[in-house]
Amino acid sequence: MNAKRSSLTSVLAVWWNLYRFVLVFHIGIGLTAGLSSFALQAATGAVDHDSASIPDTHHLTSQRSVTLDSKPVVLSRYERLDGRNAFLEGEHFSTVFASDGTLKGFANISLELAGKPLPSRERSEQIATEFLRRAAPDLLVNMKVASVAPHSEPVRITLAGRSETVQVTGIKFKARNLADGSWFWVIVGSDEKPMLFERDLQWATLLARRKSEQWLHDRWVKAQLAQQNDKTDRWNLPWTH
């Protein structure tokens, strides 16, 4: 009898611990989502207009925990409410937040920004610097500008029942943080607002490409998902920067 009671007690203890783990996990996810939304508002609330704000035309379609340079981050994806090009590699507004609430990056990939005149390099640098001053001032302390040049991001669209890829081009302000050797950049779109921002990126010098994961870039994410079961090393995945 004592043995049966001991066995039953052990089973109940296991189930109770499992229940507590699941409960804490769900609470943690909820808090993370709330903190991410709050942090985005805090990080961008002081920025001109709504350059890094979640567009009113979009809604949250996915949110998950991933790793960036071996550290936990939260990836959130917003797609258009009207369903226009609402698929992987299509239009989206995405954010990446660190566990401490730091905005690690965001991307606003919109068809509205394609095929329009771009601001000058001088104007783009001014816009990028002002964005950093308000949203990530710590990056300005030891900043070394590397380049200011046009850069394109692909977006797949459906037009008249046919799928095609167009390029959303902006002016990329690329710089290095001399304090730790990491890289960061701001891409200014045709509307003279930041359309993409990434920070604390690690670089593979010998391979002339970034080491950090590319969670804001659908082409990389798609390849990651497709090869996930094969556990393919990330060095074999496509790199866009």
Predicted regions and their residues:
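Long, terminal "pre-/pro-" and other extracytoplasmic accessory regions
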Residues: 2-4, 11-241
